[in-house]
């Protein structure tokens, strides 16, 4: 059976009905209510205040309020013995490096599921993960904004290149942890040269760009990034002071392939116990002490000490040959002596 649609009969009156417009508000009507408050000629949408700014920077300010050992600030002064950067530029670079370092700690603590930072609860456990991530990202851009005051066209490129380097290194560290993949020592050194060395490179390259007497110390900068991370890995397992600030053996709880762990696993690949400990991500102190016993049995902690000594020797050799007796490397050598006391 076929269906047909009858055409609708149109009204002879095709005039559209008149729509009544709302009356204008009376003079007593508050400008804060009603649709008329959105008259863009009257409304100012830029109401950012210092109170709102504190909301954004709260997690960052929380960590920054209790500074660490300020090693990067000390290193800034060491590099300046060589580069003699103008004081105004040096101040900006120092502020930017501190901002980036502190902001990166906020992200690190989330990625590592940490509990303590500098002896205090981590920021995400106070402010929440989402606001903490936002705060860290915000400070990255505040740092970039601050660099614009240097009026140096090369600075932005340096900033971008070194933050890319840092995130590449961080990605590999996280990938190995999350896939339970033990890297080689060479892969580890490449990773830390990027991850830990990224901010060192950033600091040095910006100072070099602002200096009237630039000098090539990049091999020293790269080795400094490596030695700082190897030392951090060792102290995480063996330092009581470190344990009070970050928690005992936190790298084991995180499941991280730190330098002593890598050496131990590769020294005895048939023994899977240490891999299983990393997989469990245990916070049990007895389990972590047992893992350290395994590393001691493979000589991994002593091996780590020897590697540190070897890197120190390499840095000393480069500095002596570059300095030519002028004494500009004294600051770096003194700092190395201070931070490498492991016993």
From Swiss-Prot:
Its EC number is 2.5.1.-, 2.5.1.1, 2.5.1.29, 2.5.1.10. Residues 1-12 have a biased composition (Basic and acidic residues). Binds 3 Mg(2+) ions per subunit. Dimethylallyl diphosphate binds at residues 117, 196, 229, 236, 246, 256. Residues 1-26 are annotated as: Disordered. Its cofactor is Mg(2+). Transmembrane segments: none annotated. Mg(2+) 1 binds at residues 108, 112. The record marks 140 as: Important for determining product chain length. One of its GO terms (molecular function) is metal ion binding. Mg(2+) 2 binds at residues 108, 112. CDD domains: Trans_IPPS_HT (cd00685). It holds the Pfam family polyprenyl_synt. PROSITE patterns: POLYPRENYL_SYNTHASE_1, POLYPRENYL_SYNTHASE_2. Belongs to the FPP/GGPP synthase family. PANTHER family: GERANYLGERANYL PYROPHOSPHATE SYNTHASE (PTHR12001:SF44). This is Geranylgeranyl pyrophosphate synthase.
């Amino acid at each position: 059976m076929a269906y047909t649609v009858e055409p609708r009969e149109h009204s002879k009156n095709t005039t559209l009905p008149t729509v009544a417009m709302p009356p204008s508000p009376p003079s007593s009507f508050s400008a804060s209510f009603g649709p008329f408050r959105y008259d863009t000629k009257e409304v100012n949408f830029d109401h950012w205040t210092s109170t709102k700014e504190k909301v954004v920077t709260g997690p960052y300010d929380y960590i920054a309020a209790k500074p660490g050992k300020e090693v990067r600030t000390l290193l800034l002064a060491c590099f300046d013995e060589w580069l003699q950067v103008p004081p105004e530029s040096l101040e900006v670079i120092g502020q930017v490096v501190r901002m980036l370092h502190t902001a990166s700690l906020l992200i690190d603590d989330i990625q590592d599921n940490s509990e303590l930072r500098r002896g205090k609860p981590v920021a995400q456990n106070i402010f929440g993960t989402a606001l903490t991530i936002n705060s860290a990202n915000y400070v990255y851009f505040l740092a970039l904004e601050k660099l614009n005051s240097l009026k140096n066209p090369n600075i932005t490129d340096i900033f971008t290149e070194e933050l890319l380097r840092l995130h590449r290194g961080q990605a590999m560290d996280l990938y190995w942890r999350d896939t339970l993949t033990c890297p080689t020592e060479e892969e580890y050194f490449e990773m830390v040269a990027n991850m830990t060395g990224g901010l060192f490179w950033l600091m040095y390259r910006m100072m070099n760009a602002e200096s009237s007497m630039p000098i090539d110390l990049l091999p020293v900068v790269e080795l400094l990034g490596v030695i700082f991370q190897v030392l951090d890995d060792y102290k995480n397992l063996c330092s009581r002071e470190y344990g009070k600030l970050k928690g005992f053996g936190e790298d084991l709880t995180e499941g991280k392939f730190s330098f002593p762990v890598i050496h131990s696993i590769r020294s005895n690949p048939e023994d899977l116990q240490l891999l299983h400990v990393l997989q469990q991500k245990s916070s049990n102190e007895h389990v972590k002490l047992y893992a350290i016993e395994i590393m001691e049995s493979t000589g991994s902690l002593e091996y780590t000490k020897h590697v540190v000594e070897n890197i120190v020797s390499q840095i000393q050799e480069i500095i002596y040959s570059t300095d030519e007796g002028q004494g500009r490397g004294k600051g770096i050598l003194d700092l190395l002596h201070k931070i490498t006391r492991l016993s």
